[in-house]
Amino acid sequence: MVNGALNQRCRSDYWACKGDVRPLSARNDVLVFQTSPLQADLEVTGRLIVKLWASSSAPDTDFTAKLTDVYPPSNDFPTGVDLNVADSIIRARYRTSREKSELMTPGQVYEFTIEMYPTSLVFKKGHRIRVDISSSNFPRFDVNPNTGEPLNRNRRWAVATNSIYHDPQHPSHIELPVIPATK
């Protein structure tokens, strides 16, 4: 993570937020999975991998994943703090290989693997663990035009409608390397 963790809330003075200071997880283009407050400290150490089963209306799009440590409200931070632990992205055209581009058939379900940087963190009792799935994490990653045109030479932009699947045939999940607590 370049420059360390960032609070996952927009600032009213940031041009991309347009005065909206809600948490990024409150956006309607972010799929959120969040635990209840943890009953005990939980150590996560190692590689973080997200497996997604997804389809898109576009021939190319991005899928992003972000692991967040959600701090409860406190005197210093009355609304709490949402600190990103790790994040990453997969461009659909490179879902099977970074060397060979392969566009999607719109509406077809594909498996995607998003590998985040390894981490070592103890999520403290009372905190929540959150995973955000989206199709963009700008400005950290460049925007996908969703058209399938050659990268950086696109002449048009398209809105992609993406679907994430989570059922026995399409088990989307995150692999968290939990280290058992010692007594």
Locate predicted features.
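Intrinsically disordered, low-complexity Ser/Thr/Gly-rich stretches
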Residues: M1-K183
